[in-house]
Amino acid sequence: MVCLSRENFAVEGKRKGTPCSSLGAMAITDGRFNEAQVIARLKEIFATSDPRISIGIGDDAAVVTGGPNQILTTDMAVSGVHFRTDWSSAFEIGRKVTAANTADVLAMSAKPDFLLVAVSLTGSETIEWITDLARGIKYEADLAGAHVVGGDISRAGQLVISITAIGSTNKPITRSGAKPGDGIYLSSLTGWSAAGLAMLNSGSTEVGEPAEKALSEFKSPTIDYGFDASNSNALCDVSDALVIQAAQMAEASKVCFNFDLTKIQASAEFVELEKVAQKLNADIWSWIFAGGEDHALLATGTDLPGLLIGEVTQGAGLANVPAGVEANTWQHF
């Protein structure tokens, strides 16, 4: 049995919040709703009868039964940095932040099991907005097969969402196992999120399936939870950009990642993504290799599922990266 707990920060420097699984910290009262109403709503949304959860939301900490090798990861999303409330609905934001965490668990060839969610609200949110955020988290968690077992709510000057994900696996797969002769695979083509961001930044009113997919992938990315990476030699999530994380895998494995652009161009997704790039007069290769915010998995091995995009060879670094591609993903510092 594992007890999952997280000490809360002092609220406004005055008092401690209640511990993690109570999903409460400070009273949020402005005439529209109060803390008790929020907690009651969240308990209803995240209710579960999973036998692995002995104690869930409502006590000082959650008590769960973990798997053989537990995988732990955390990811924080800040309004104005990772998402914008004028671009995305609360439901979409909930999905997006959850996906960022579940993807990191999948990138270790693990299954997401439990989530702890901490949210700071500004006080301007409505109970409906908070409910939709929780429903978005719940929706993505259900897709991943995970359960929210606790968290924390506080009030601050900026909307911040932090999720800790706990997963399990019989055999963790890291970035350092790539071998010469391995194929390089993506669970799905990258670049869609960057395309969606470009559309929003440009004010594009483009319609049609490719444009709708680009916007959707930016607002709430689609993760292939059925992608079987168990036979991979090396594995990584590419949310920081394909060119960045391929370089990290190559360095960790002491090999060279040799890309085959003709294989990428031959994919059906490339043809669709190219339609959006042409409408915006954008460089599709920059989107694919350097766009970031895609939660595809990058794997090496033999006869793996997904899109074959190259081969691991002896040497170091990356080969055949398209000319002019530079990683342009967000750098916090």
Task: Walk through the language-model features, giving the residues of each.
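Targeting/processing segments of secretory and organellar proteins
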Residues: 2-3
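Helix-biased detector of long, well-ordered alpha-helical tracts
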Residues: 20-333
